[in-house]
Amino acid sequence: MKIRASVRKICEKCRLIRRRGRVMVICSNPRHKQRQG
């Protein structure tokens, strides 16, 4: 899980979602997981 100021899709399988007011990226590749902090 990377915590970044700006999250964006890295590949086509990345999906931007909102959980508890936080923007997150979920992907089949675990290295692409990101959270906005």
Swiss-Prot record:
Any one GO molecular-function label of the UniProt entry: structural constituent of ribosome
Predominant subcellular localization, coarse grouping: plastid
Locations listed in the record: Plastid, Chloroplast
Any one GO CC term of the record: chloroplast
Key words, A-Z: Chloroplast, Plastid, Ribonucleoprotein, Ribosomal protein
Biological-process GO terms, alphabetical: translation
Keyword Cell inner membrane applies: no
SUPFAM superfamilies associated with the record: Ribosomal protein L36 (SSF57840)
InterPro entries, A to Z: Ribosomal_bL36 (IPR000473), Ribosomal_bL36_sp (IPR035977)
Similarity remark: Belongs to the bacterial ribosomal protein bL36 family.
Protein name (record): Large ribosomal subunit protein bL36c
Protein's organism: Cycas taitungensis (Prince sago)
Gene name as annotated: rpl36
